[in-house]
Amino acid sequence: MNDFRHLSRDEQKLLADVALLVKDDDQEFNYEMLKVAAPDEASGEFWFRMAEMLSTLPPNQSLDLRMTGGRLAVAVSILSVLLQESPDIPQLWAQKVIALNYLAHGHRTRALGLAQQPDKAAEANEEEYLAKALSQNLFSTLKDALERFPEDSWFIEMRDDAWQHFGSEQAV
């Protein structure tokens, strides 16, 4: 477990609450509210740790695919802001890649499942659109990460994996 003693008490408490929400796989909760509940002077590490927790799968391995208020979408949002401020930290890029990878794969899988049901064609198309948009974001993020860290084997492997799963027409 991470040592958060150097964070403020308010930051520690909120991170403990986040950990419980993730552990319990609460997919009714609007995780955007955590940003509002954060201390006014929250540290960059606090925000990274929150995004890291939100992009970690709960014990039941369930993906929260909600694009508004969902765990993974909020993690991507937080990490996007952090990357604007600190683009030279590879862990930020990696965590964003992880969250986007989960979202893109989850929506692609949902689209394929819905496509098997004739009465769900519209929903399948919507999910496929989301999967494509998320995979494009994933490729763009990997491209930017590899421009900064061209020799990083993890980013290279993730790019190759994304290429294999989402098609070479979008790959970096």
Q: Language-model segments: which ranges?
A:
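Canonical positions in the second alpha-helix
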Residues: 36-37, 81-82, 118, 145
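Amphipathic alpha-helical repeat scaffolds of TPR domains
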Residues: 4-19, 39-63, 88-128, 153-165
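Short intrinsically disordered terminal tails
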Residues: 1-2, 170-172
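Eukaryote-skewed repeat-based solenoidal scaffolds used as protein-protein interaction platforms
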Residues: 82, 125-128, 140-147, 151-157
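Helix-turn-helix repeat elements of alpha-solenoid scaffolds
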Residues: 18-32, 64-78, 130-139
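Conserved positions within tetratricopeptide repeat
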Residues: 31, 69, 76, 93, ...
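Residue-level detector of the short coil/turn that links helix A to helix B
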Residues: 25, 70, 104-106, 167
